[in-house]
Amino acid sequence: MAASRNGFEAVEAEGSAGCRGSSGMEVVLPLDPAVPAPLCPHGPTLLFVKVTQGKEETRRFYACSACRDRKDCNFFQWEDEKLSGARLAAREAHNRRCQPPLSRTQCVERYLKFIELPLTQRKFCQTCQQLLLPDDWGQHSEHQVLGNVSITQLRRPSQLLYPLENKKTNAQYLFADRSCQFLVDLLSALGFRRVLCVGTPRLHELIKLTASGDKKSNIKSLLLDIDFRYSQFYMEDSFCHYNMFNHHFFDGKTALEVCRAFLQEDKGEGIIMVTDPPFGGLVEPLAITFKKLIAMWKEGQSQDDSHKELPIFWIFPYFFESRICQFFPSFQMLDYQVDYDNHALYKHGKTGRKQSPVRIFTNIPPNKIILPTEEGYRFCSPCQRYVSLENQHCELCNSCTSKDGRKWNHCFLCKKCVKPSWIHCSICNHCAVPDHSCEGPKHGCFICGELDHKRSTCPNIATSKRANKAVRKQKQRKSNKMKMETTKGQSMNHTSATRRKKRRERAHQYLGS
């Protein structure tokens, strides 16, 4: 499931290596991990801080992990804010109201009853996106209802369900059949027997469909996805309602144990995780979640296998490469362009933006992964990997350097290959688009300005945090002083008013006497 924000450019700007605007939002780890984060309808919230270049950090706050738009989840709480019992009770009630109308057990029971119905009685409400039992028909008589739902249709729920379209929260861009079939064939060729599908519903259903139609295929799949609608199509051992931004299982320990058992089956052998997160999501919380899944997998490993890594395919735009490799240094990016059915830009060929920017990041050696030559991929002997047709090997860089599928040009001044549309700017002293602003947003670290790292990994971050803490304390003292002066002024005003009142009373008594 891939999500876009307000257009391709916004996502590319956020993911570009080292490219930082005048401000940004970062996820921070709480000082005391033992203190649980407050809950919103999507599980534990994340702690954020706004960072502005040249200015200090502002007050930290908790917000929803899954929703980038306050209209979708308006949770907001300052880190140091104390809530009353009434507000906490109201929040808990709101969180309960926002949960799916049916429990996981109820969904399974309804599904088992549904598949036993004759074809003429199998109905699906397209308005409510729900499988209907005969007792439900009356409540949906005014809705748009699809009849004669076949078993084949039940096995392809991603084609029955309308894709969620909120771009900032959970927009669903589903793998095109070409890319999905390539992934299934590749997983089979690499010898994997189990696939943990994190946010990849179409891959999950194609794996199950292939297994049901091909006796030679023994690949099993478990889907973890935030879209609870899939719970009505799968048994408990095939689907878990899950938020990948905070590692939250909506159905609690039962679902967690399903995932754990799947990861640790056969002592963790023969499994791979394939994930397709929303592109608008922050890389850091995703990396933290994936490391928790890796740790769960490692629990089933013997001491001799402690050096092994869980094989992973992380499907994401190529301009997030530096961010992903920051958290997973063993990952490499493949040239394969992943397509999506319902996205006008993320498509293979020349119908999309500059062909699909979506790639596969993996810790599997690239020389083991064969890309389809009929789609224009070729093997580069010096690089020992498959590359796209126009990705030419650069002798100076000793690499096939293109990231976007076009032929890149080597810049002798920058000492690296750059996009064909870029030119070298003598003012900026690096290559950039021809119409760029030389006085535009600076690149690099917010703290020291260096280009080779982010603020979170800056060697000067401790000094910066001490300075920020001192500034916050100074601001707090100033705020407290202003409050005291205001209170003092109000007290003095009250005293003066009391004195005036007493003087008037004495004057009235004097005049009356």
Swiss-Prot record:
PANTHER family: RRNA N6-ADENOSINE-METHYLTRANSFERASE ZCCHC4, ZINC FINGER CCHC DOMAIN-CONTAINING. Its EC number is 2.1.1.-. Residues 466-481, 497-506 have a biased composition (Basic residues). Residues 337-357 are annotated as: Regulatory loop. This is rRNA N(6)-adenosine-methyltransferase ZCCHC4. It holds the Pfam family Zn_ribbon_GRF. One of its GO terms (biological process) is positive regulation of translation. Zn(2+) 3 binds at residues 380, 383, 393, 400. It comes from Homo sapiens (Human). Changing residue 276 to A: Loss of methyltransferase activity. Zn(2+) 2 binds at residues 125, 128, 140, 143. Changing residue 343 to A: Strongly impaired rRNA methyltransferase activity.
